[in-house]
A protein has these predicted regions:
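Conserved acetyl-CoA-binding loop-helix of GNAT-fold acetyltransferases
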Residues: 112, 118-131
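Conserved GNAT acetyl-CoA-binding A-motif
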Residues: 126, 133-146
Length: 150
């Protein structure tokens, strides 16, 4: 997938001048990287499992936005689409509930490896994810977040 389509220019605005950044949608090839970043960002009892990400990538890999620096995953946003406008616990657990025709884009995770946190990456990733949802004609997005993660 052509990363220029996603507008990586914001990386320069954040002070990242290296040329080896890429922004793209997810695939099963990203499973280990996504699972690793999740474990870096959340305590063991809160982190989604590798099996959970396997199912998510299978059902809605095109709703993962991944930022790589070379071959290292730095940040990702993921979530599925649904006709429901409220995010429920079941949605986190059952990737098959994804409905590509759904008018609502849920956001299940916003993850950035600790070495790159507090540098504006997550905010820009969310902006790009929102832009993509609008481009796809979604009515809105839903994100829940623990206060200490904001």
């Amino acid at each position: 997938m052509d990363s220029s389509r996603f507008g990586c220019s914001w990386l320069r605005d954040l002070g990242f001048t290296e040329e080896n950044w890429s922004l793209r949608k997810g695939s099963m090839e990203d499973l280990l990287a996504v699972s690793y970043v999740e474990k870096e960002c959340f305590p063991p009892l809160e982190a989604a499992t590798e099996d959970s990400f396997r199912e998510r990538l299978k059902f809605y890999g095109n709703h993962f936005l991944l930022l790589y620096k070379g071959d290292q995953l730095i940040s990702f946003v993921d979530g599925f689409c649904t006709k429901e406008e409220n995010l429920t616990d079941l949605m986190y657990e059952d990737a098959s509930l994804h409905d590509e025709e759904g008018s609502w884009q849920m956001i299940f995770g916003v993850n950035t490896v600790p070495a790159y946190q507090r540098r504006g990456i997550a905010s820009k990733m969310l902006e790009e994810f929102i832009r993509m949802a609008k481009e796809e004609g979604r009515e809105g997005l839903v994100l829940t977040c623990k206060k200490e993660k904001i």
